[in-house]
Swiss-Prot record:
Name of the protein described by the UniProt record: Malonyl-[acyl-carrier protein] O-methyltransferase
Gene encoding the protein: bioC
GO biological process: biotin biosynthetic process; methylation
EC code(s) of this entry: 2.1.1.197
Task performed by this protein: Converts the free carboxyl group of a malonyl-thioester to its methyl ester by transfer of a methyl group from S-adenosyl-L-methionine (SAM). It allows to synthesize pimeloyl-ACP via the fatty acid synthetic pathway.
Length: 251
């Protein structure tokens, strides 16, 4: 797997900061799933690691928690701050948190650790800042995500147009270093056409490729081939994600 260019990732999400919430269907669904896995926990202090524009920071704040919103992207943090999503804001990398040990009841990270170079280091970092009795709750993407995108692009060229994610076995092995639970669930979204499906990826900042990308614009003919090759259901273009979730207990 290619190393992640953190500055490029931050820039991609920064460009998407203003439109992120309107495109973030996947983030909302994965957050709902992770909340269900947490059950009746009521953390008094929460780290929202990879907070984006702050929708979940706001959720935890409204639930009565003291929230620290953390993101690699300054524009995303500014967006969160403009919404008064949290009480504290930190620009930092999840793999190297500049935070004290045992500070939070919950370290929450929804669809952010896939942008880390080392998942084990990211989870170790999150685990470190959680108090005994607390938890790390996270979601990420597993291999097998975006099969429709890969299939459609094969009708146009042989280049890579989406990042490859870690296998379920690798994710599970990493999480097994701690006490907790994990699972994987498919999430399928539907869009009016291929262009809307691809814009949903761009709109959440997720079009940055770790291996680099070609910036040649799509021609009309290429877009037509994409549309014809894209798997559809009832006339709508699908995007399927393999969503991996984990809840790690802090003993």
């Amino acid at each position: 797997m290619s190393l992640v260019n953190k500055r490029a990732v931050a820039a991609a999400f920064g460009r998407a900061a203003q439109s992120y919430d309107s495109h973030a269907q996947l983030q909302r669904q994965s957050a709902d799933l992770l909340l269900a896995k947490l059950g009746e926990r009521r953390p008094a202090s929460v780290l929202d690691a990879g907070c984006g524009p702050g929708s979940m920071s706001r959720y935890w704040r409204d639930a009565g928690a003291e929230v620290t919103a953390l993101d690699l992207s300054l524009p995303m943090l500014r967006q969160a701050q403009s919404q008064q999503a949290a009480q504290h804001y930190v620009a930092a990398d999840i793999e190297a948190l500049p935070l004290a040990d045992a500070r939070f009841d919950l370290a929450w990270s929804n669809l952010a650790v896939q942008w880390c170079n080392d998942l084990g280091q990211a989870l170790k970092s999150l685990h470190r800042v959680v108090r005994p009795g607390g938890a790390v709750a996270f979601t990420t993407l597993a291999s097998g995500s975006l099969p429709e995108l890969h299939q459609a692009w094969q009708a146009v060229d042989s280049r890579l147009h989406a990042n490859r994610f870690l296998a379920e076995e690798t994710l599970a092995e990493t999480v097994s270093a701690w006490r907790g639970q994990w699972g994987i669930e498919p999430v399928t979204l539907a869009f009016d056409d291929a262009l809307a499906a691809m814009r949903s990826l761009k709109g959440i900042g997720a079009t940055h490729l770790h291996a680099g990308r070609h910036n040649t614009p799509l021609t009309r003919g290429q877009l037509q081939r994409l549309q014809l090759a894209w798997p559809q259901q009832q006339g709508r273009c699908l995007l399927t994600y393999s969503l991996f979730w984990g809840v790690i207990e802090r003993d």
